[in-house]
Structure formats: structure tokens, C-alpha cells
Amino acid sequence: MEETMKLATMEDTVEYCLFLIPDESRDSDKHKEILQKYIERIITRFAPMLVPYIWQNQPFNLKYKPGKGGVPAHMFGVTKFGDNIEDEWFIVYVIKQITKEFPELVARIEDNDGEFLLIEAADFLPKWLDPENSTNRVFFCHGELCIIPAPRKSGAESWLPTTPPTIPQALNIITAHSEKILASESIRAAVNRRIRGYPEKIQASLHRAHCFLPAGIVAVLKQRPRLVAAAVQAFYLRDPIDLRACRVFKTFLPETRIMTSVTFTKCLYAQLVQQRFVPDRRSGYRLPPPSDPQYRAHELGMKLAHGFEILCSKCSPHFSDCKKSLVTASPLWASFLESLKKNDYFKGLIEGSAQYRERLEMAENYFQLSVDWPESSLAMSPGEEILTLLQTIPFDIEDLKKEAANLPPEDDDQWLDLSPDQLDQLLQEAVGKKESESVSKEEKEQNYDLTEVSESMKAFISKVSTHKGAELPREPSEAPITFDADSFLNYFDKILGPRPNESDSDDLDDEDFECLDSDDDLDFETHEPGEEASLKGTLDNLKSYMAQMDQELAHTCISKSFTTRNQVEPVSQTTDNNSDEEDSGTGESVMAPVDVDLNLVSNILESYSSQAGLAGPASNLLQSMGVQLPDNTDHRPTSKPTKN
């Protein structure tokens, strides 16, 4: 049904909706006009952040979407973020800020994985919330994350839906009970941790590097810095047909190359650097030897030039250039430009100055992509835009060479290389764990307590899980597990064999497992004196079974595979000579009990050592329980002692 409103299905795509509450307008045309005004206000309000942002594939955009199938008319946007996941989380920040700036708007956001906000906060979700019942429950309201809960008991809260709500039902609940549906502090903290630092974080995600580029590309990037993303993607996703256009360059001749500074996102820079590529000899692009100080600048420029040439080769040689004048002819452009001026987008620049025109060009381009016709055929492709700029922008190669002599220093790219310690720190920050005290790694390893391993494993084994699988203990302070001993022994009676007055059936009834379904249903029961005596006798029988099994296994290879405690002294012969136990145990030592903790720790350490520093079952299981083993130093190469 449309009312469930399943969103993004395309890979690496995020979709977002903004609803107006209360929605009292009955006139669809009037409602459309209201929402169009909101789109204009939102884009202009956040233009200082959105316009200069370099998007991996598609920018943040909003358009009017009419009501259909019970879903009211709303503002809708879709962005393909590709390999740069930071684009998606920046959009989450923008959506959060929109609902904060405009309290009458409610937003929901999903990607092709579904409710990815819940995935981010998976460690803190209530047990009832799962992918099957989370539809239309997660919204942003007043700048805060809200989750519409399910009723814990039938009839507890009449306004809570027992099934996933429809969009109209969800909007009504948010309107009437916005304070009661606020997500828990831990869930909100997990999401806020992911978007912490914006908008300042935008600058931290950029990387400036020197590139040896044709003059035409330098001029284009001065006017449209965001086109670097399209060029990198064209090179990164090239195929043999694309490279045919790069055998002989027709648009960007290598003879016109000059040094310039290019701003990438870190994702784009990494994509460009990590690919090995040898240009065709006929292209005219020659690289200096790798030892040359400017080798990296030449290599980056060569790759980027191939991307721009591929983009231009996909355009018709006679494409219409009338599209470039359609931006300022749009009826929305005048009001959009006026709103930009009111929001101090131009930062007090003098109208007509070079910097003013540069920001105006960026605004026109963003208006075309995000406001006027984000999915229209009138929108120019990147290649058409590049060719249009080459035809309309005058540039002087000599002036560009003078600018090349005074370039700002490029950024250090050491962030491309991560040490194991830095990787561990990033993983800990990703799950919200930080070391509160500055203890050296050597001190931690020396003071490491192996009992933490055994205690964590015991807690895991003691946790009663459901049919959905094993559950890791969430907190050490969790209540102890209750246990129905009577039901447990009845269960073992059927496993070990029937009593003389019982049938020989090996089948277990469904009710025999009910006591093991959930730790919430198990509890101690009070027994009558007769029942307690019977229970004690059953326990004694079970112990005798286990003792006999131990004696039989004591002389096999199985017993040698375990580490035992110190051997127990031989049983005194002066005890009751008529005892039945003397027949099998006289003159022999009682089998020493297995040291469970020592065996557990030694087996885990052996498994951890065999991982050779890679991921494996031992480290994965322990880390999921919050136990971090120190590095295995036994296999590290050590320097040989020198002779005096």
C-alpha cells in the first residue's frame, strides 16, 4: 500500500520527505503553492551550506510531490551518494536542522537499507523494535529524533498503534503526542554522534592538492568547483569505450597544461589516487619519473583530464546551448535570488565583482539542479555544462600561469594511511567508546586480567536466548537469570530415559520447551516438603549419572585434552568397607575436576593466536562482549643479541 510509503530502493540512495502539520488545507492547488514556498525558503535558508558543498553524485534537492494512496502531499527529495557515505549523513544533519528551523515540518528519511538511523543505534533499540514493525515509526520533529512506540499491553495507550501506522496516523500521533514519542537519550546520542561537527565538518572533509591540468579545465573548475566530482567519477568508472575518446584528446590538449590547486572531497581524492593507470601514448600525456617531486601533481592532473575528456565525449557536437539562459528566465529565480541576498549569501561582496559573480554562478547552477528542474530533461549534463563554460568564459593562459606561481600549499595526505592503533581508535569512536584515562599500551598489556575473558564468556553462556538466536548480555548490572529447576529436571528425565512407569516415547512435548523460551518467563517456585524431597532425590540421581560418566571418560583420550586442577589425594581405605563405591574406586585417585576457567582462557588464546592478527571467531566474540585482548607479542620478530 502507498500508505506504508516504502522509500529508497536504488543502491547507495537516500530519500527524504517533509510533511506539513497540521495539514488543514483542502485545496490541492493552494496546498501545492504553500509547499513550493517552503521549498524556496528551505533552499535559501541553507544555501550557504548547500551551494558550495561538493557532492559525490547528486545534490540535496526538494520538489513537490502530490498526495497519492492516502499519503498527503509533501516535499520530497532523493540523492544518490555513491561511495561517499558522508553525503548521506550531511543530509541527515540538514533534515534535522530543517525541522528545528521550521517546527511545523516533520521529516522522515530512509536509504536502500531501510531505517538506517535505527541501524546506527542498533545497540540501544528496545527489543520490540525490528525491521518488520518499524515502518512509518521514525521521524524528525522539532529537530529531535522521534520513534512512535508500540503498546506494551493491550489497551494500555489507546493512541498507540498495534501495527505499523500509516502516514496519516503517524502524523496525527506526532501532532497530538510529540513529547511522548521522543526517542531515548541513548538512541538520539548514537545518531547525533554520527552527525556531530557539522557544518564545520564540511571543511574537514575537503582535500586540496596540486594538479598539472590543461588551462580549459582550470578555467572550468574556477567557475564550477563541483564538476571535479563528475570528472573523478567518469575516470573512476571508465570502460574501454570511454577510453577510445582519450586516445587523442580533442578538447583538453596536454600542451596547455599548467599547475593549479584543486579542491576534492577526501573520498574523491582517494578514488583518484588509488587507481593505477597508464595513459595511451597517442594522448600526449607523459609522466615524469616517480622520483620527481611533482610526479603526484602530474599523475593527478593526467587522471582528472581523462575524466573531463570522457564527459565531453558523451555530448552531441551540436547540443543546444539555449538551456544556459533558462535559469534566469525561471519565475522562481527572482525570488530565490532575493532570498539569497536576505540570508547574506554574498557576504557583503560588491555586486559585479569577480567573487560576487563566482558565487552568483554557483547559486544559478545549484538553482538549476535542486530547485527548478532537478529531474527535468532541460537540465544540462556535466559534459554539456563543461562545453558551455568553455564557450562563454574568457580566460588567458598567461594569467593562469602567473597564478600558478603563487599557489597555496597542498594538504598533507597522511590520512590515507592508517596505523593499527588509529584504526582501533576509529572503531571505538564508531561505537561510542573512548578511553577516559591516558594509560599507555604497555601498561594496559601488563595489567591485563584474563579473568575478564572467562567471566564474560560465563555471562554469555548463562544468558537465556530466544528462538531468534543468542543474545549478548547488554549490561553487567542486568538482573540475574531465573531458573525453573523442576521443569529443567523433567526435561533431563526425558533426555536420559523414561522411568519404569513412563512410556518409551522420546518425543518432547511443546510445553517442555516453554520454560526455556525466554528469561522473562522463568522464575523460582515454592515447593511443598514432599516435593522438595523428591527434587533432592532427582538431583542426586543426576549427580550420580554425571560422576559415572566422568569415571568412564577418565581413562580415555578425552580426559587428557583438558587441564585439570591438582590431583586429589587417594580416598582413605579406612572408610566403610561395605560401601558400593569401594568396588570401583579402591586404590585409585579420584579424577581431578577440570579447571573450566583455565581451559576456557587457554582455548580462546590459542584461537586468537591462530588468527595471526586478522579478524576471527575469538576476537569477534570477545569484542562483541566488550573484551579487548592485547596484541599477541609472541610472534613479533625480536632482535638477536649481539656478541660482545
From Swiss-Prot:
GO MF annotation: an example: histone acetyltransferase binding
Residues recorded with modification Phosphoserine: S503, S505, S518
Chain intervals with Acidic residues compositional bias: 503-523
Segments for region (Involved in nuclear export): 481-497
Ranges annotated as biased composition (Basic and acidic residues): 431-447, 524-534
Effect of L489A: Decreases transactivation activity
Effect of substituting D484F: Decreases transactivation activity
GO CC terms: cytoplasm; cytosol; nucleoplasm; nucleus
Keywords: Activator, Cytoplasm, mRNA processing, mRNA splicing, Nucleus, Phosphoprotein, Transcription, Transcription regulation
Cross-referenced InterPro entries: Ecd
Polar residues bias locations: 567-577
Result, substituting I481A: Decreases transactivation activity
A Pfam family it matches: SGT1
Chain residue ranges for the region called Disordered: 430-449, 496-537, 567-589, 623-644
Region (Transcription activation): 439-644
Role summary: Regulator of p53/TP53 stability and function. Inhibits MDM2-mediated degradation of p53/TP53 possibly by cooperating in part with TXNIP. May be involved transcriptional regulation. In vitro has intrinsic transactivation activity enhanced by EP300. May be a transcriptional activator required for the expression of glycolytic genes. Involved in regulation of cell cycle progression. Proposed to disrupt Rb-E2F binding leading to transcriptional activation of E2F proteins. The cell cycle -regulating function may depend on its RUVBL1-mediated association with the R2TP complex.
Assembly and oligomerization: Interacts with TP53, MDM2, TXNIP. Interacts (phosphorylated) with PIH1D1. Interacts with RUVBL1 mediating the PIH1D1-independent association with the R2TP complex. Interacts with RB1, RBL1 and RBL2; ECD competes with E2F1 for binding to hypophospshorylated RB1. Interacts with EP300. Interacts with DDX39A.
Descriptive protein name: Protein ecdysoneless homolog
